């Protein structure tokens, strides 16, 4: 049987960038474990803040963290109180100077992780899985997605035997490297056990010249 490679990792270095940007020789394992700790801590603290990705950059004794969220107001808090509290907690966790940058997600319905979390939340709230999946897919297509595929696996509707249900709309080219496909896997904890929710969203093609133009404009903006 043909196995599916993770679409995010498959495109790293082609149209996707790394989520951890640092180099280490001897301390690689220590930094990697620290990255995992940081990501888990942020996920735990910002459960309801619709966080899609966390990017980590390192320089000397400084850690720069970019949090991509659909609810920046919730992360920042009144007068920046919440983000300052989070920064202090991360300072203690890592023992380094932490700088946090909040990036707003303009279209949350085009982020696979957020769509998956939405489906999972509905499944936990006892909404019928077909309805939850189809509503999420319709919202994504209305937001401008070229295609979407969703999959739910487990004891659906409390059935004795677990099974897998898939629905798709539009096209999702998994082996075209220039295709901007976002993928995420999320768990839904229901009274009947855990369900796995997978989401693939195709957002169009990223052509090399477009990518280079974006890179050049960023470099010019930084000068």
Curated annotation (Swiss-Prot):
The lineage of its organism: Bacteria, Bacillati, Bacillota, Bacilli, Lactobacillales. Keywords: Ribonucleoprotein, Ribosomal protein, RNA-binding, rRNA-binding. Pfam families: KH_2, Ribosomal_S3_C. This is Small ribosomal subunit protein uS3. It comes from the Bacteria. Gene3D superfamilies: 3.30.300.20, Ribosomal protein S3, C-terminal domain. GO terms for molecular function: mRNA binding; rRNA binding; structural constituent of ribosome. One of its GO terms (cellular component) is cytosolic small ribosomal subunit. It comes from Pediococcus pentosaceus (strain ATCC 25745 / CCUG 21536 / LMG 10740 / 183-1w). Residues 38-106 form the KH type-2 domain. SUPFAM superfamilies: Prokaryotic type KH domain (KH-domain type II) (SSF54814), Ribosomal protein S3 C-terminal domain (SSF54821). The gene is rpsC. Belongs to the universal ribosomal protein uS3 family. Part of the 30S ribosomal subunit. Forms a tight complex with proteins S10 and S14. Binds the lower part of the 30S subunit head. Binds mRNA in the 70S ribosome, positioning it for translation. NCBIfam families: rpsC_bact. GO terms for biological process: translation.
